[in-house]
Design a protein with these regions (language model features):
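Hydrophobic alpha-helical transmembrane bundles of multi-pass membrane proteins
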Residues: 2-153
Length: 153
């Protein structure tokens, strides 16, 4: 009888660490998902701030810089060149540019997988940026598609 009590006590004690490990594993999983969510939102916020900074560098920054390089009578024309280039590059990027740059195709030219931004949503794209939404990645890349021809004008 005494041995049976000890076996019962030992078997109950053996179950306690397993239950504690399960609870600890659940807490650890919850903490990891919280850290991942915080990291993802932080990454997204930084990418959006960076996108806005590049847009400001193109819009008022580059337009005013070029406006200061010309004579007084040509300032508006020079400013409008920069702003029209921004509008045109945005439309072209949304229609075909992103798809040709980042679609799956050859090593030099993508396919029309993302034509008119079809399939570009809020979920991360594991091929390019695993912690930010696909839309944020597309916007960030679009800013450089905007500023590149604006630098040439």
């Amino acid at each position: 009888m005494n041995i049976a009590k000890h076996l019962l006590f030992l078997s109950a004690g053996a179950l306690l660490p397993a239950a504690a490990q399960d609870a600890a594993a659940e807490k650890l999983a919850a903490l990891q998902s919280g850290v991942t969510a915080a990291q993802t939102s932080g990454d997204n916020a930084w990418m959006l701030v960076s996108t806005a900074l590049v847009l400001l560098m193109t819009g008022p920054g580059l337009a005013l810089f070029y406006g200061g390089l010309v004579r007084k009578k040509n300032i508006l024309g020079t400013l409008m060149q920069s702003f029209i280039m921004m509008a045109l590059a945005t439309i072209l990027w949304a229609v075909v540019g992103y798809s040709l740059a980042f679609g799956e195709g050859s090593a030099f030219l993508g396919d029309l997988r993302y034509f008119m931004l079809k399939g570009v949503g809020g979920d991360p794209n594991g091929d390019y940026a695993a912690t930010i939404p696909h839309q944020t990645f597309m916007l960030f890349q679009m800013m450089f598609a905007i500023i590149t021809p604006a630098l040439i004008t």
